[in-house]
Amino acid sequence: MGDKNDKEDNLSLPKATVSKLIKEMLPQDVKCSNETRDLILECCVEFIHLISSEANDICGREQKRTIAAEHVIKALTELGFSDYTQKVSDVYDKHKLEVSTKSKSSKKFENLGKPTEQLIREQQLLFAKARSAFQASPEAQQLQQLQQQQQQQQGGLQAPSVQQQTDINTTTTSTIQK
């Protein structure tokens, strides 16, 4: 449907982010017009296209299928932006460190040294205890009484009493513990 130029026209950077960066870089007494902001935005997009195109070429020459950070750093050097390579490398190293730290913390609970079956039994025991505690609460007893009254009014079967339910839960809990 659309050609390559249509896709490129839709590619841009968030204006709010670019505006924020411009504001941070300029002295407080200097303002930036919308036209200037748009021009800077276009320049940034063009710069990204230039770097990514060169990184893609480097990637192709190395017969790789995925553009890596190293390709981007080489592209900066080959295009005459070697002044930026150290900063880019530093930011990339920091990013790798953050990702590895985040990955380690997400796996923190992965292997607690207990088999899955034991963890499931412990979870079921906790559920049974919570259920017993709730059923022993005054709110649960009131709810139970209301349900019994409704069933009696409807002529249905009588629900087990709170004591009967507690006995059932105690039996269930002791069975799970075994």
UniProtKB/Swiss-Prot annotation:
One Gene Ontology cellular component term attached to this UniProt record is: negative cofactor 2 complex
Q: Which GO terms describe its molecular function?
A: DNA binding; protein heterodimerization activity; RNA polymerase II general transcription initiation factor activity; TBP-class protein binding
Report the sequence similarity comment from the record: Belongs to the NC2 beta/DR1 family.
Where in the cell does this protein reside?
Nucleus
Tell me where it mainly resides.
nucleus
Q: What CDD domains does the entry give?
A: HFD_Dr1 (cd22905)
Protein name in the entry? Protein Dr1 homolog
**What is known about what this protein does?**
Involved in transcriptional regulation. Component of the NC2 complex which represses RNA polymerase II transcription through binding to tbp and thereby inhibiting the assembly of the preinitiation complex.
Keywords of this entry: DNA-binding, Nucleus, Repressor, Transcription, Transcription regulation
Under the heading InterPro entries, the entry gives:
CBFA_NFYB_domain (IPR003958), Histone-fold (IPR009072), Ncb2 (IPR042225)
Q: How does it assemble?
A: Heterodimer with drap1 to form the negative cofactor 2 (NC2) complex.
Q: Which GO terms describe its biological process?
A: negative regulation of transcription by RNA polymerase II; RNA polymerase II preinitiation complex assembly
Q: Where is this region: Disordered?
A: 139-178
